[in-house]
Amino acid sequence: MKTFFLKEKQVDKKWLVIDAEGLVVGRLAAFVAALLRGKHKPEYTPHMDCGDNVIIVNAEKVHFTGKKLKDKIYYRHTGYSGGLKKTTPDNILNGKFPERVIKMAVKRMLDDGPMARRRFENLYVYSGSEHKHQGQQPEKIDFASLNRKNKK
């Protein structure tokens, strides 16, 4: 029996939409990262971009468990000496771009490298309930009903 290798033409990418209102950030990010990689498909191939396109709406209404909203710290560096910057999820969610919390969580759950960067481009996060991908007829996924711990 020969090993099956997926070809570029055989990839069937679907469009999925997830409403993030009231969902726990870490659980949502892990689920979305698996969808972007295509791990839920039987024809999953590690060296191919066989994952789906994922749209997340209501990104500003996500929840953190415990005291992570105030205590968790995101670090970044400007590249200059003494340029270490810190921020919390609370500052980001109340700021100008609240969708960055979900984007950072999903990006950090993907592996590093060019394939992960290509997969990450298939993620679309919006802070409101509207999105501009109605033409693709996305399929709605009720992530909250999959496990009682997914919703807070």
Swiss-Prot record:
UniProt GO molecular function: mRNA binding; structural constituent of ribosome
Pfam families per UniProt: Ribosomal_L13
SUPFAM superfamilies named among the record's database cross-references: Ribosomal protein L13
Any GO CC annotation of this UniProt entry: cytosolic large ribosomal subunit
GO biological process: negative regulation of translation; translation
Protein keywords: Ribonucleoprotein, Ribosomal protein
Quaternary structure note: Part of the 50S ribosomal subunit.
Described function: This protein is one of the early assembly proteins of the 50S ribosomal subunit, although it is not seen to bind rRNA by itself. It is important during the early stages of 50S assembly.
Similarity-based family: Belongs to the universal ribosomal protein uL13 family.
This protein's name: Large ribosomal subunit protein uL13
Annotated organism of origin: Wolbachia pipientis subsp. Culex pipiens (strain wPip)
